[in-house]
């Protein structure tokens, strides 16, 4: 009899929870419509995978790409709408969050065609790969719109779990296993530190979890200048630092870049930084409003260390992927300048614009690494010598992306850095901008060194890998080269017409 009553109570409680969830989704689902499209795409992928054979592989790519493009379209249709807080305060929809979601979706859309040939050549499981990519994209989008501490913790964990699985996707590769283990351990440690910081914020604000309510709670409890807030600030900075990978929280980055499948590295190198930057701007700017001087100082230290260490160590690297790992550490130092400048002096607008250019520059470079690696099986920088003699398109497109990463005019990277540094200079960050300018010159050196190798025509310098290099027979049907072409165009042409892009970015400020 007791068991029967308990069973009835359990059924009633479950029904209430289900009805509440259905009610929330019914009345708030339109606010996360782009995310719902991705969820539908995930379900469709699983259904097709369970009912079809490997001959239907093209459908998997089509469904994934279509889901991402439809999600981008839904975001664009929602542009300029009034900011809305939904799901009982868990999510906030505004232009600032949506443009970061757009950047994540754009990166994922470009990464799928970049991965097609790699998956076919390495015989990786296609369905799981695409599921992890879409789920990680979903986690990044939820993180961009997160408005409370619980969602800010759960969303990046969704992204991180998929990242761990993707980085260890080539299970027979010892380097991949080592990178995944290191990534998992450091990711778990950083998540623990992040939660520790959240607990201090929660307690100091009197039990509030929404970002704006935390500020009100700190005012009511008079705890906004307490030691607990300082502990929370340091802990959260460390936790977010792992996602952004600035120095000295960069230890996992070179190993994961080198050991993971190259399309996975291309995906993680941008999406993780975009999502973490969106979260960092809101966490630092809202709950830590009264500690702006303290977090500005912390981020300035991280930016200086990242720009100096990242670019100096990149010079010494012999692996192309490790070089890009340290280059990305330097690049995040430039992005942090925009976070520090903030809403004033168009800091956020310049940061968003530079991130848009960084996606195209970085993915274009990784597309070249994927293409060259599949045909030669090497990642060593020296083995690229003389590539221009065998594949002029690949060599020239690589050179343009590298020059744009270095910030040479008139490419997009130059104008992106110029506006970012100018905003920092107007905000009085003279020392930080000076370090950025000097380290940009250093980065040009190692990018030009690679370009010199690509363009060399002397037979004695051409490596056996390039001598035996075979070009793709169907260039128009090569998805890697399609991705690379899009990235090269985006790395060059937008730099000439910056004002419309900056104007759109300025409209995203909250």
Curated annotation (Swiss-Prot):
Pfam families: Ndh2_N, Proton_antipo_M. Keywords: Chloroplast, Membrane, NAD, NADP, Plastid, Plastoquinone, Quinone, Thylakoid, Translocase, Transmembrane, Transmembrane helix, Transport. GO terms for biological process: ATP synthesis coupled electron transport; photosynthesis, light reaction. Its EC number is 7.1.1.-. It is an enzyme of class 7 (translocase). It catalyses: a plastoquinone + NADH + (n+1) H(+)(in) = a plastoquinol + NAD(+) + n H(+)(out); a plastoquinone + NADPH + (n+1) H(+)(in) = a plastoquinol + NADP(+) + n H(+)(out). It is a multi-pass membrane protein. One of its GO terms (molecular function) is NADH dehydrogenase (ubiquinone) activity. It is found in: Plastid, Chloroplast thylakoid membrane. The chain crosses the membrane at residues 24-44, 59-79, 99-119, 124-144, 149-169, 183-203, 229-249, 295-315, 323-343, 347-367, 395-415, 418-438. NCBIfam families: NDH_I_N, PRK02504.1. Belongs to the complex I subunit 2 family. NDH is composed of at least 16 different subunits, 5 of which are encoded in the nucleus. NDH shuttles electrons from NAD(P)H:plastoquinone, via FMN and iron-sulfur (Fe-S) centers, to quinones in the photosynthetic chain and possibly in a chloroplast respiratory chain. The immediate electron acceptor for the enzyme in this species is believed to be plastoquinone. Couples the redox reaction to proton translocation, and thus conserves the redox energy in a proton gradient. This is NAD(P)H-quinone oxidoreductase subunit 2, chloroplastic. The gene is ndhB.
């Amino acid at each position: 009899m007791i068991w029967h009553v308990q069973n009835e109570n359990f059924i009633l409680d479950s029904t209430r929870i289900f009805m509440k969830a259905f009610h929330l989704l019914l009345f708030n689902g339109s606010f996360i419509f782009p995310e719902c499209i991705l969820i539908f795409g995930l379900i469709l992928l699983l259904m097709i995978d369970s009912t079809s054979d490997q001959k239907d592989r093209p459908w998997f790519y089509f469904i994934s790409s279509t889901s991402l493009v439809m999600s981008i379209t839904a975001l664009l249709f929602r542009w300029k709408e009034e900011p809305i807080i939904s799901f009982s305060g868990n999510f906030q929809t505004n232009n600032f969050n949506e443009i970061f979601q757009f950047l994540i979706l754009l990166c994922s859309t470009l990464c799928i065609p970049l991965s097609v040939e790699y998956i076919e050549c390495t015989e990786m499981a296609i369905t799981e790969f695409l599921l992890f990519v879409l789920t990680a994209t979903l986690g990044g989008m939820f993180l961009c719109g997160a408005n409370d501490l619980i969602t800010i913790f759960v969303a990046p964990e969704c992204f991180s779990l998929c990242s761990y699985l993707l980085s260890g996707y080539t299970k027979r590769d010892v380097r991949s296993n080592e990178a995944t283990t290191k990534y998992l351990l450091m990711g778990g440690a950083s998540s623990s530190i992040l939660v520790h910081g959240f607990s201090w914020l929660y307690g100091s604000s009197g039990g509030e979890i929404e970002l704006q309510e935390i500020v009100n709670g700190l005012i009511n409890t008079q705890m906004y200048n307490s030691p607990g807030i300082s502990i929370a600030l340091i802990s959260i900075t460390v936790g977010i630092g792992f996602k952004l990978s600035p120095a000295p929280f960069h230890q996992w980055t070179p190993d994961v870049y080198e050991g993971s499948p190259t399309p996975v590295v291309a995906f993680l190198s941008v999406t993780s930084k975009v999502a973490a930057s969106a979260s960092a701007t809101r966490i630092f700017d809202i709950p830590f409003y009264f500690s702006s001087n303290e977090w500005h100082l912390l981020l300035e230290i991280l930016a200086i260390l990242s720009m100096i260490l990242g670019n100096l160590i990149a010079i010494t690297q012999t692996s192309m992927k490790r070089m890009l790992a340290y280059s990305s550490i330097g690049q995040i130092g430039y992005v942090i300048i925009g976070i520090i400048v903030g809403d004033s002096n168009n800091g956020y607008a310049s940061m968003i614009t530079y991130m848009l250019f960084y996606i195209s520059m970085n993915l274009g470079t990784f597309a070249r690494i994927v293409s060259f690696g599949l045909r030669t099986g090497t990642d060593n920088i020296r083995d690229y010598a003389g590539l221009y003699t065998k594949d002029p398109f690949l060599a020239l497109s690589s050179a343009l992306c590298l020059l744009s990463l270095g910030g040479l005019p008139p490419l997009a990277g130059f104008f992106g850095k110029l506006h970012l540094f100018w905003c920092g200079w107007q905000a009085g960050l003279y020392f930080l901008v000076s370090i950025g300018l000097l380290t940009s010159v250093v980065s040009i050196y190692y990018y030009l060194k690679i370009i010199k190798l690509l363009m060399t025509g002397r037979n004695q310098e051409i490596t056996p890998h390039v001598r035996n290099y075979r070009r793709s027979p169907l260039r128009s049907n090569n998805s890697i080269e399609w991705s690379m072409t899009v990235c090269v165009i985006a790395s060059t042409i937008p730099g000439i017409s910056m004002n419309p892009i900056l104007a759109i970015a300025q409209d995203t400020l909250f």
